[in-house]
Amino acid sequence: MKTLEELDACYRAMPPVAAMGIESAGWDGQRLRLRAPLAANINDKGTVFGGSMASIATLAAWGLLTLRLGAEGIKAEVYVADSQLRYLKPLVADLGAEAWLDEGTDWDAFLRSYRERGRARAQLLARVTDPEGATVAEFSGRFAALRAP
């Protein structure tokens, strides 16, 4: 995948993600932003469901790595290996997410590993935001890229 249109089509093809109304909101080659409506992600308390926060953060990081690989001409299978999410406060509005590579991830070494061994791992970060851009949750995840069959 190389474009936001392709990424959005991929998200729409996954029934749980489509139900959440997640769509891309921006991509600058380094950071990916997503958004989703409160109405599709509301819980019994009238706030965003915690699982929706975890999902949009994971999908932002997954999408970022997928797009960065696509920009390198690489079609890989990307998987989340493990992740952590810290909830900072409830959200009673539409949600957003922004993902980027952790500063400790050496992109050139990642690409070298993938090209030589057919697999590589990267640490990604994301934040879940309110409509004004304030952070309501912080995500950290380790992702694996495997050579596509």
Feature map (PLM): residue ranges:
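Non-catalytic linker/capping segments at the edges of enzyme domains
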Residues: M1-R35, A39-A40, I74
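Residue-level preference for beta-strand/loop junctions
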Residues: P16, Q30, E77-Y79, A93, ...
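Short structured motifs
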Residues: A18-I22, A81-Y87, A109-L111
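Hydrophobic residues positioned within well-ordered beta-strands of beta-sheet architectures
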Residues: L34, A81-S83, A97, A122-L124, ...
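Hydrophobic residues in beta-strands and at strand termini
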Residues: A36-L38, Y87, L101, A145
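Hot-dog-fold acyl-thioester-processing enzymes
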Residues: P37-W62, I74-E77
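Hydrophobic beta-strand-centered segment that forms part of the acyl-chain substrate-binding groove
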Residues: L64-T105
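HotDog/MaoC-like acyl-thioester-processing domains
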Residues: L91-V92, D102-P149
